[in-house]
Design a protein with these regions (language model features):
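Conserved donor-binding/catalytic core segment of Leloir-type glycosyltransferases
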Residues: 28-46, 52-56, 70
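Carbohydrate-associated surface elements
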Residues: 18
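Acidic donor-binding loop of glycosyltransferase active sites
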Residues: 115-129, 142
């Protein structure tokens, strides 16, 4: 950005998007029923079908018999045929009874949804500029599994709350999910590390103070 604007790097301040932490109260222990979660628009670009495929693979491996899939997010009339296609896929695999699909949640419903997840994944097909849903999952104390593209590497590496996989590796997501689900205690510890990182670096209350400091810094130094 500094190069594009032809200004000194010392003149640039990084100020990420943030969230209000009110209501985010992560569980201290792993959920009784292991649950893989998705919270984003229910559309191909966000990779919902890729997550459904990964879930089917995990179930068919025989290592995750009690694993459930919880899907939530915005859904428009345009998205309905795609979502119906995922339902058919899950029905054919004999797994539809272990899957919940809850479109268009309000904030309180979203908070409760996130609290009950063991691991969170949105395998977006394009590089996300940020991905607020990742910050929300981490704030809820849920470890994340994401493609190594866009803003995801920076968020995951800063928060230490999840795993990245090569988006060109068809098995990368499934293997990363499997490794987290195999060790619930380590997964919960990873999620709590992510929660603490979000509280420190992405809370709106702290970001507001940081923004004021960034604005006033040139004035005070002149």
């Amino acid at each position: 950005m500094a190069e594009r604007l032809k200004i000194s790097e010392d003149s640039v301040r990084h100020h990420p998007n943030g969230i209000t932490l009110d209501g985010f109260s992560p569980r201290r222990e792993a959920p009784e029923i292991p649950t893989l979660g998705y919270l984003a628009r229910l559309c191909p670009l966000k990779g919902l079908d890729l997550l459904v495929d990964a879930y089917v693979e995990l179930k068919q491996s025989g290592k995750h018999e009690s694993l459930r899939l919880a899907i939530a997010g915005g859904m428009t009339e345009e998205d309905e045929p795609f979502v119906d296609e995922q339902r058919r896929k899950l029905t054919q695999a004999g797994l539809i009874d272990q899957v919940s699909i809850a479109p268009n949640l309000d904030r309180d419903q979203k908070l409760e949804f996130l609290r009950n997840l063991s691991v969170f994944s949105v395998p977006a097909r394009y590089p996300e500029a940020f991905g607020l849903y990742v910050i929300e999952a981490l704030a809820a104390g849920v470890p994340v599994v994401l493609p190594e593209s866009g803003a995801f590497p920076e968020i995951v590496e800063n928060a230490q709350g999840g795993k990245l996989y090569d988006p060109n590796d068809s098995m990368g997501q499934t293997q990363s999910l499997d490794s987290i689900l195999q060790d619930p205690s380590a997964a919960k510890a990873m999620g709590m590390t992510g929660h603490e990182a979000v509280a420190e670096g992405y809370a709106n209350e702290k970001l507001a103070l940081s923004l004021v400091d960034h604005i006033l810094e040139p004035i005070h130094s002149s």
